[in-house]
Structures are given as C-alpha cells and as structure tokens.
Amino acid sequence: MGTVKAAEIIVWAKVAGGGYGCSLPFFGFERQGAPVTAFVKLDESPIRPKTQVYDPDCVIVLDSTIQNAVDVFEGIKEDGVLVLNTTEEMVNVQVPETVRKVATVNATDIALERLGRAVTNTAMLGAFVRCTGWVPLEEIVAKVEEYWGKENAALVEEAHDLTQIREIDGKA
C-alpha cells in the first residue's frame, strides 16, 4: 500500500497547490507480494480520462530490484524522468535513450536510519519533488505529517536534500 498512498499524496499536493490530479492503483492478477503499480496524472486543467498511463513522463521506482522482473521504462516518453531508490552510484545507473533526467537517492538506508524500517515511499516523495518540481514540497510534507507524523515528514525533507540529479545529453 506504500506505493498507492504515495501516489495519493502526490495528487493531494498537486490539488492543494492549485492544479488537478488523479491516482489509479493497479494490483494485477498476482497474489500478495507481487509488484504494485500506481499511476498518477497531473495537469493544470481537469483530467477526464481515468485510465492507466501507457506513456509516462516520469517513472518512480521504490525498489530497484523490480527492474529485474519488470520493464519499468516501458512506454516512457521522450525526455522522460526516472526517480530511483538505489545504492548504486549515479554513473552506474543505466537508462534508455528516452530518459533525459535521473534522480537517485538511497531511500532504504535513510528510512532505516530515521524510522528503523525500510519504508521507502515517503523518502521517494521527497526525491520526486526535488527532481521534477511538479508539486510543492511543503504540501507533500504537510500531508505526510498528517498521515504518518513528524518523523516521516522529516524523512521526506531529508531525502529531498540528499537526492542526486543527473541531466543527460548535456541538458544540464
């Protein structure tokens, strides 16, 4: 449910910041333990079609091992964005040619240090905001604090500050 709740918080932050959004979870046919996908649509005008996203602008990967089982880049748009929880050095992160911006953070270690458990969804919210700027950080922090308390809100801010960003093809 961490993925689903993170998607809901992104939408809430967009709406609170004056835009529109919707989140759509997808659980697939597998049983417990299978990867969970959540789609988020953000816009400055109302969003009518409530369907899966087949050509994302951004992909957020909460667990980097998922890349061994699923093509997380499937359909990503030209000039796409990747936000990745990883222990890898930025130079070792491999992305397709369509990705122009990569953000990495070790959300697992940050969460373990701060919370004592590997809850990566809140940390990845901070990384997403740092990389894209599509939603206000203060709105994310406020909603996370409302749901999970001050320690999780501080986790968002810490991950935001520790996120490394790389622009690809000299667009930096």
Language model regions located:
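Active-site cofactor/cluster-binding pocket
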Residues: M1-A172
